[in-house]
């Protein structure tokens, strides 16, 4: 059995992947992500108000999706270096689990506490919002990563 070379990524356990993803997310563009989340939530709330009804939980959920999608995608597209960032760029779909799961947890809490959803409805809402963030983050890493490799 040969030892992996320095350029080769050793396989990480699921727990180690979450730790590395958390480390990479610490370098996320949080101000930009927060602004995107606020704009999306405000726009969604304005559209609902124009339609004649107040839908705060829906607007907040849309804002959470924008917040975590921009944070996750921005993390992968930033030019920061480090082992965690290198791992995240090389494994964008595995990295995307972190922002997707975080969005799902926040949306679940919002929909159960503020919204009219019960536990089952809140879980369904959380899963599909998390899936959207997962897809957008993974796509940003895949497309942005391939463009960076092609340009280099």
Where are these regions (language model features)?
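Juxtamembrane/disordered regions of integral membrane proteins
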Residues: 2-152
């Amino acid at each position: 059995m040969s030892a992996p070379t320095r350029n080769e990524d050793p396989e990480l356990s699921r727990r180690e992947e979450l730790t590395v993803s958390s480390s990479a997310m610490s370098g996320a563009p949080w101000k930009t992500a927060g602004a995107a989340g606020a704009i999306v939530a405000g726009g969604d709330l304005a559209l609902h108000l124009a339609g004649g009804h107040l839908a705060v939980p829906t607007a907040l959920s849309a804002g959470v999706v924008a917040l975590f999608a921009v944070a996750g995608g921005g993390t992968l597209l930033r030019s920061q270096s480090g082992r965690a960032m290198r791992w995240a760029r090389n494994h964008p779909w595995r990295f995307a689990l972190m922002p997707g799961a975080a969005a799902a947890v926040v949306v679940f809490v919002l929909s159960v506490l503020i919204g009219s959803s019960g536990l089952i409805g809140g879980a369904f809402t959380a899963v599909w919002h998390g899936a959207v963030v997962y897809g957008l983050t993974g796509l940003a890493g895949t497309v942005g990563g391939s463009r960076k490799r092609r340009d280099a």
